[in-house]
């Protein structure tokens, strides 16, 4: 037993579920830049609060889905997609009976999900999509939503790229300003609400001084 009895529950959780493992991507972050994991988790909490109470939610471009459990805590059911089978295998290998999610390997741009969801979100995804396919991606996201659904997108700002790592810059093929992303999203959603983050701090400040951009979209067109 633990010295303080209230911590005895931790031993019971460990016995029932085992010791939790980081995913392929989150594990790499924890090794190379531990503070970044806290920043990533805060982005997922924002999404969770925006989609709180939704029945069925879809994440596009989930990576290892380690942080996706935060969103799962706020909704009834979570489906996560990625086009890389390595990440989907990693998710399934770490499956947790208490926090089950449906993990699917598919290219979202080429293959519509086939379902309508109450919420759709994508964090750190749209900057990886070529500008020529951007409208198709948002069109797919809109089609995947119910009429009263909410979409949330998060992406690093164009202005932040001078501080991005070499690894990040290699994959970032479509970074924009807050205003440019808003204009792109308004082609597909009637209402686009803009938020910003600097590290884990959420705000509605000047877009050009924001490291990370978040868009909450309502009213699909």
Language-model features, listed with the residues they occupy:
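Conserved N-terminal segment of class I S-adenosyl-L-methionine
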Residues: 1-121, 132-139, 144, 172-180, ...
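Short catalytic micro-motifs in class I SAM-dependent methyltransferases
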Residues: 124-125
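A structural motif corresponding to the C-terminal end of an alpha-helix
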Residues: 188-190
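Short glycine-dipeptide loop
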Residues: 145-151
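Short, glycine-/aromatic-enriched active-site segment of Class I SAM-dependent methyltransferases
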Residues: 153-173
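Hydrophobic C-terminal alpha-helix "anchor/cap" residues
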Residues: 51, 185-186
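A short His-aromatic
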Residues: 128-129
């Amino acid at each position: 037993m633990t010295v303080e009895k209230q911590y005895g529950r931790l031993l019971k959780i460990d016995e029932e579920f085992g010791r939790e493992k980081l995913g392929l991507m989150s594990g790499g972050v924890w090794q190379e830049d531990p503070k970044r994991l806290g920043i990533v988790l805060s982005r997922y909490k924002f999404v969770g609060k925006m989609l709180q109470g939704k029945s069925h939610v879809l994440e596009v471009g989930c990576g290892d889905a380690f942080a996706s459990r935060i969103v799962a805590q706020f909704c009834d059911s979570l489906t996560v997609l990625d086009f890389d089978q390595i990440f989907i295998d990693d998710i399934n290998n770490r499956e947790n009976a208490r926090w089950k999610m449906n993990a699917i390997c598919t290219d979202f741009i080429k293959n519509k999900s086939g379902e309508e969801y109450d919420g759709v979100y994508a964090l750190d995804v749209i900057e990886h999509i070529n500008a020529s396919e951007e409208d198709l991606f948002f069109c797919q996201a809109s089609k995947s939503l119910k009429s009263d659904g909410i979409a949330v997108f998060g992406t690093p700002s164009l202005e932040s790229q001078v501080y991005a790592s070499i690894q990040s810059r290699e994959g970032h093929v479509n970074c924009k300003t807050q205003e440019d992303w808003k204009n792109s999203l308004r082609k597909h959603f009637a209402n686009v609400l803009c938020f910003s983050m600097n590290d884990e701090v959420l705000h509605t400040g000047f877009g050009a001084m924001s490291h990370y951009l978040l868009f909450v979209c309502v009213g699909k067109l």
